[in-house]
Each structure stands twice: as structure tokens, then as C-alpha cells.
Amino acid sequence: MLDANKLQQAVDQAYTQFHSLNGGQNADYIPFLANVPGQLAAVAIVTCDGNVYSAGDSDYRFALESISKVCTLALALEDVGPQAVQDKIGADPTGLPFNSVIALELHGGKPLSPLVNAGAIATTSLINAENAEQRWQRILHIQQQLAGEQVALSDEVNQSEQTTNFHNRAIAWLLYSAGYLYCDAMEACDVYTRQCSTLINTVELATLGATLAAGGVNPLTHKRVLQADNVPYILAEMMMEGLYGRSGDWAYRVGLPGKSGVGGGILAVVPGVMGIAAFSPPLDEEGNSVRGQKMVASVAKQLGYNVFKG
């Protein structure tokens, strides 16, 4: 049994130590994100037996952004299976920025990872759907199943993103021209942008992590969301590419599968035990929450979790 007092103490200590840490800045290339109050901070744990521990602004709803890639990858694995995902999308880190087109050029237009923009747009196109609206509704539904029914599209975030996503449109056309997009290019880009524009809070983000930790069963709803056999593929991708250019550093220092988003959220999974999540808008140069990384790492260290430990 996990000690409830110890878990609450871990999140309290992480929040107290790092919630006012200086450094980083909000993502400024998306107008909505630039205007989120930079002093916000939160950290939460959701365990596989459904207990919740949190500190800070844990009810504040923020843009899911790139963490949505985890949900869409999960749905693609359910739809077409792990071999097809690896064949059509790839399963390797790029070693390049998350929105880079260089990796596409170096590999004949094929994306390498579903957790960077090119691979994520391709993954969105891989979802079984007859049209854009069905594709979008299926992706929104998997987000809600994994994290909570309150996850919903923000029209304000979506509008802010749709008017500035020229780079992603270019990526979509490159994928399409190389034969690695499985629906209309602008449909894929539009739905991808929408999936990044949903709002979530820190407890819901930790619930997403706990659902993965529990082998695909949401510990708050007790409903199976994913096949257990698909979860290890998601966690492997998170370990390799979840924090972009910081992924290797994260694996070395923290040793947990993780995923960040430029909305300031960050997620880590302790398989079989819990999800840990944090939120704070200021980002490092790779697009990861400065305080969020510190808070999640602190919780993991205090509790002694690292998948590489014997």
C-alpha cells in the first residue's frame, strides 16, 4: 500500500520548492499561450488505485498541446496496431527540434516519431475515420476517456493556433507529397491543431498518466480505455522523444516515461503505480516547462521511482 501522507508530502514539497523558480518564458508564437499568467504552477499524483494528491493551481485549465500526441498515438495503436504504426510513422527519436522538417528531408519524407509534429500529423491522419469531424470526435473521445470527461476544445486556443500554424501546414504537405499522410493534408493539419487546443487541468493530466500506468484502465472511472499490450509502445515513445531535445537528459536524470507540451504541462508515468503531472507556463529553450520538470523530478526522487532501478 502507498502511504497517503508520504504522497501528499511529496507533492507539497515539490510545489513549495519550485513553484516560484525563475527561468524560462511562455511560448510566444501562439498568442493564447503568451498571455497565460506565468506565475501559475501545480503538481499532482493520481495512483493506479484511484487516489489523488495535488498542490498549487491544480484546477487551472491549460492547453494540452503536444501531450495530445500521446492520446492520438494510443488511438492509432488501437486502430491499426503497433506494427503498422512503426511501419507508417516510425519509432525513433529525431535528435532535432519538435517542429523540424530536416528529419523528413533526411529520411525521404517519412516521419520518425509520433511524438514530434511531423509524426503526430501523420498519426492523426492514420486514425480510422470517414471524414474530418469523425476523426476529430474520436480523438477528443480518447482524450476524455484517458484523462476525464471535462477535457474539451477551447475555441479561443484553436483560433489562436489555426491562424499561426503555417509551419505545420508545410509539414503536412511535405508528408503528403512523400506518401506518408493517410488523409487530405489540410484535414490532417486542422484536426491535429484541434487536438492540441483542448483544455485540461493538472489532476486530469495525472489521471492520463495513471491510466497508462494501470495498463490502459482509467483508475477513476474503472473503465478499460486501451488494450494493455499497446501501453508499452506508448511508454517507449515517451521515453525516447517525450521531452524533445531534453528527452535523453530526462531519461538520465529522472528515468520515467514523460511527455511535455508548450502549454506548460508535463506528464510522467510510473508503470503499475501512478501518473505524476505538473503545470507551469514558462518553458526552456526546448519547449518544456521549467518548473514542471523540477516538480515532477522532485516527486519521483522523493518516492524513489525510476524505471531503470532494480
Swiss-Prot record:
GO molecular-function terms, A-Z: glutaminase activity
EC number assigned by the record: 3.5.1.2
Gene Ontology BP annotations: glutamate biosynthetic process; glutamine catabolic process
Positions carrying N6-acetyllysine: 294
Catalytic activity field: L-glutamine + H2O = L-glutamate + NH4(+)
Broad enzyme group: hydrolase
Positions bound to substrate: 66, 117, 161, 168, 192, 244, 262
Keyword terms: Acetylation, Hydrolase
UniProt similarity note: Belongs to the glutaminase family.
HAMAP family: Glutaminase (MF_00313)
Quaternary structure, from the entry: Homotetramer.
NCBIfam families: Gln_ase (TIGR03814), PRK12356.1 (NF009020)
PANTHER family, sorted: GLUTAMINASE (PTHR12544), GLUTAMINASE 1 (PTHR12544:SF48)
Protein name: Glutaminase 1
Source lineage: Bacteria, Pseudomonadati, Pseudomonadota, Gammaproteobacteria, Enterobacterales
